[in-house]
Each structure stands twice: as C-alpha cells, then as structure tokens.
C-alpha cells in the first residue's frame, strides 16, 4: 500500500485523504458563490444600474414621508410612534429592540422623525451618486427600517418589505469604498446576486400562487380585470381608458397575468439568453402597470430587480468601445489573480458572516414559499426570527379582487346642517378631476383610507381618530389633506361618509367632462361634536351600510 505524504504527520495513517485537486475545486466553488473577490464580474453594469435605481426608490420613499410623517406617527399624529413603541415595550419587555428595531427608541418627537427622513434623503442622494454606496445604502436601510418598525398600520404594505429585503441584500451586493465606479475590484458575490433575483421570482410566483389558492372566482372566470382599473387604490387617467376596452382584452390580461406569474418567471432558472427574453417580456408589463395604477414604489422595485436578469455580456454592445473597462469585457478573467493573501483573515471572516446571513435569508424565504404552497415541511422558526427586520418576506398581490370602489370622505360643519368636505391630496373625490399618476410617491393616509373603506369603522380606528384630530384643529393631521375648508379654525362637528364611485362612460365624459360618478351610501362612522368644554360627544350614529368589499 502506498502511503500518502503527510499521513504520518497527521497521525491518521489509515484515514482516507481527498485528492488536493478535489479539495481545491470545492474551495473555489464555494468562494465563487460567497467571496466577492471571485464574484459575478459579468454583472458590473447591471449592478451599477440597479443600485442607482434602488437609491432613487429610497429617495422617493423618504421624500413622500417627509410631508406625511408628522401627521401619521408624530406626537399629535393619528398613530403616534411613541404610543406604538410604548405598547411594544410593554408586550415584549427586554426584547423590544429586536421586535421593533428603530432609531425612534431614542426619540420620536417631530424634529426627530423629520431628521431621520432628511438623513435618509441625504444618504439616498449619496448612493445615487455612487459615493460610499455600501455605507450610504446601510444608512438608507436603517432609516427606512426605523419608520417601518414604528409606524404600525401605516407600514403594513408589501412594498415596504420588498424595499427592506432588496436593500439589505444590496449591502452585500454593493461595492465598498468611497467612489468605486463599476466596482471591478469588488464584484458582487454570486449569492447576493442570486438572492436579489430570487426576490424578483418570489414577488411574481407567490402572487400567482395566492391567486390560485384564494379561491376567488374572478381569476377563474377571467373577470378579475373587468373593474380592476377603477377599483385600484389610486387609479390613473390611463387606467380610465383601459377600463373601457372590450371584455376580451380584460380576459386576455387575466390569462397573461397568470401565465407570467406562474410559468414565465421560471425562465429565471434557464440560461442567460432565456433570461433576456424573460426580461423583455416582463419589463413592458411592469411599465404598463405603473401607467394604469399608482402602487407607490412597488413596481419600480420589481423593475429594478428585473434588470438583474440582464448581464454585461449583453449590455457591453451598447457601450462605446473607448469607454469599455476590461472588467466588463465578455472574456473570462483570471480568478487566480484574486486569490486571498495570507493576511486576509479579516476578509474571509466577513465572507463567512455575510454568507451565513444570506444563506439564512435564502432558507427562510424558501421555507415560507414551501409553506405557502401547502407543504409545511421546512421549519419556519428561522423565518420568524427575521420577521422584525422585514428581510425575508412572503408576497402575494391581488389574491382577491375588490368588487367596488368606495371612498371615505371627511366633512366638517358648524351647525350640523351644512357640511364642507376636506379635500384629499390624491384620492378620487371631485367628479371632474382626472385621476393622476403619482407613483412612486406614496400618500399613505390616502392608501389606508382605501383599505378602511372596504371594512367597518370598528376595525379601522384611524377614522374616528382623524375625526377627533380635525375637531381639535390638529395642523399635522390637517396637513395630510389638500386644503382646510375652515381656514385654520376648528369646526364644531365632523363626520365621515361613505361614497361608492364608478368611472363614467366615455360618452358621459364627453358630455359632462366628469371622470367619475358617485352615490352616497351613508354615515361610515359616528359623527362627532366637540362641546364647549372640549369634550367629544356622538352627534349621530353610523348608518347601516350595505355589504361592500
């Protein structure tokens, strides 16, 4: 028997020893997935574009909150962050910081809230300019997580989870350094690229899955899109015209949606040319969704993630030859040139830590997908541990389609007879006002009222709270509206009424100029009177409203 060199020294003469070449190959394979030094160097341009898009999405999120945050969660807002954090502290005790990770534990005053938003805006601008991108994106993520963790019902949107998940993974995807350019010396690790693509896949596939699992007949009888454009949270004027296209078009849209979400997205797992075809199918679709419905920054995240289906081999043809950097040329690069040196222990420790975190996210999201599909065979505890950070999410858009458009309108009065409406900034209200295109701006107050209109006031306490705030002439809450009908004074009575809205026909619009018609359904919540001593009293009970969803 031939003794291998080194057996005696190891004291394991009889133990099998793997050939060195096999061990080396295994090490290289692992490092190709987790070590940026051996990363996906054919995705440098794509990464650069994606990170600029992510920075713009962060900017839109912080910018829209800057004008709303005091009225939403300020000390005098509808759901004060301080009250929410206090409730979290009482429930979770010593683990409250884990269950609600937020800078607002330090302070949640109005100046503190707006300061965090300004810091987020500044960091998003730095990230867009590619200055300290990894650090800038980390600051963006911390600031946005701080809001989401403290905002209660005002941060329960899937788009918030999408941004936090993509933002966290991007901390490992982005290049380091103050001004890295394309980051050819610090390419993205393959695991981070794969997880961003995996998020893109799950947004589509899980949305298709919930449509099938919900049992909503509208998806099965191909009528789900018949009133979709009218009933969406914030319609657009383009959606108005698409709504009036023939039923065959709406039915075809249903089929296309299901095919894309349940079938075409699997093209992600095919070779690069197939992924390119997928990219050129889904991108126009997402642009169409943006034009026909205001879903804040949701579709912009999906667009940005979808761009990672492309690679530099394809994009290089659009780059002038004199601008091409060797790092983005199609030829393979010498990976040995990026072998770690003996002094790179700190680097390898970072690779191991980042690999652990990213594998944790990968497992958690896979377990949630398997559970959603009805096969709870994987433990969900790892996913539950990450839940407070919103970095391993389940998605499922439009599982059940709404069957009508309902709008809550706040009205004030000084005599209880003549009522003046508080005008919203973005929600449909005036019949002759065209619905606009506002995304990626997100008016969270308007959005939450759309959801509230589908239920009753007992389960949507933001409605009676808003009534009281208007009676108190709270300027932060009044700032959530377009205008104050009482010019800075408080009315004596406030009520919330419920309307049902429909798009007008094309012929009616030509004759009247109205985009909408509506019917009053009744009093949504109790009308409230403020007495001379400052106490509140119910002036009228809510009406018994017809069923609506």
What residues fall within each predicted segment?
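Basic polycationic patches enriched in arginine
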Residues: 3-4
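Short, low-complexity intrinsically disordered segments enriched in A/P/G/S/L with frequent Arg
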Residues: 8, 13-18
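Alpha-helical membrane-anchoring segments
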Residues: 21-549
């Amino acid at each position: 028997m031939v003794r291998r060199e080194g057996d005696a020294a190891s004291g394991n003469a009889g133990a099998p020893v793997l050939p060195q070449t096999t061990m080396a190959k295994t090490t290289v394979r692992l490092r190709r997935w987790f070590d940026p030094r051996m990363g996906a160097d054919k995705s440098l341009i794509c990464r650069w574009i994606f990170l600029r898009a992510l920075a713009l999405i962060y900017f839109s999120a912080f910018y829209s909150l800057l004008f709303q945050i005091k009225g939403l969660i300020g000390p005098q807002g509808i759901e004060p962050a301080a009250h929410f954090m206090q409730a979290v502290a009482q429930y979770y005790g010593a683990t409250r910081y884990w269950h609600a990770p937020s800078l607002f534990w330090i302070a949640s005053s109005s100046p503190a809230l707006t300061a965090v938003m300004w810091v987020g805006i500044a960091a998003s601008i730095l990230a867009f300019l590619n200055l300290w991108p990894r650090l800038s994106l980390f600051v963006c993520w911390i600031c946005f997580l701080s809001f989401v963790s403290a905002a209660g019902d005002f941060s329960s949107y899937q788009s918030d989870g999408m941004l936090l998940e993509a933002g966290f993974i991007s901390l490992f995807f982005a290049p380091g350094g103050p001004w890295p350019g394309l980051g050819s010396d610090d390419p993205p690790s393959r695991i981070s690229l794969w997880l961003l693509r995996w998020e893109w896949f799950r947004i589509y596939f899980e949305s298709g899955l919930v449509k099938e699992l919900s049992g909503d007949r509208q998806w099965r009888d191909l009528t789900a899109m018949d009133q979709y454009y009218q009933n969406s949270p914030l319609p657009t004027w383009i959606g108005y015209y698409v709504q009036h296209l023939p039923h065959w078009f709406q039915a075809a849209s249903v089929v296309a949606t299901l095919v894309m979400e349940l079938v075409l997205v699997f093209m992600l797992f095919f070779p690069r040319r197939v992924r390119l075809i997928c990219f050129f199918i889904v991108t126009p679709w997402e642009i169409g969704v943006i034009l026909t419905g205001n879903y804040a920054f949701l579709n912009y995240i999906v667009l940005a993630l979808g761009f990672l289906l492309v690679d530099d081999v394809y994009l290089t043809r659009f780059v002038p030859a004199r601008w091409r950097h060797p790092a983005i040329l199609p030829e393979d690069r010498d990976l040995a040139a990026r072998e770690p040196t003996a002094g790179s222990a700190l680097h390898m420790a970072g690779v191991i830590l980042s690999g652990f975190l990213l594998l944790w996210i990968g497992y958690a999201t896979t377990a949630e997908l398997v559970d959603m599909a009805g096969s709870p065979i994987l433990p969900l505890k790892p996913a539950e541990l990450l839940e407070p950070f919103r970095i391993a999410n389940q998605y499922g858009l439009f599982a059940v389609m709404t069957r009508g458009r309902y709008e809550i309108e706040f009205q004030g009065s000084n005599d209880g007879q003549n009522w003046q409406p508080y005008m919203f900034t973005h929600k449909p209200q005036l019949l002759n006002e065209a619905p606009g295109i506002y995304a990626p701006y997100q008016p969270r107050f308007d959005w939450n009222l759309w959801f509230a209109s589908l239920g009753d006031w007992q389960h949507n306490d933001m409605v009676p709270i808003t009534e009281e705030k208007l009676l108190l002439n709270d300027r932060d809450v009044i700032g959530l509206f377009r205008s104050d009908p009482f010019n800075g004074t408080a009315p004596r009575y406030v009520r919330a009424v419920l309307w049902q809205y429909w798009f007008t026909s094309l012929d009616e619009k030509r004759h009247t100029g109205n985009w909408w018609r509506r019917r009053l359904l009744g009093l949504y919540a109790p009308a409230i009177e403020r007495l001379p001593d400052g106490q509140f009293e119910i002036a009228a009970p809510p009406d018994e409203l017809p069923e609506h969803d």
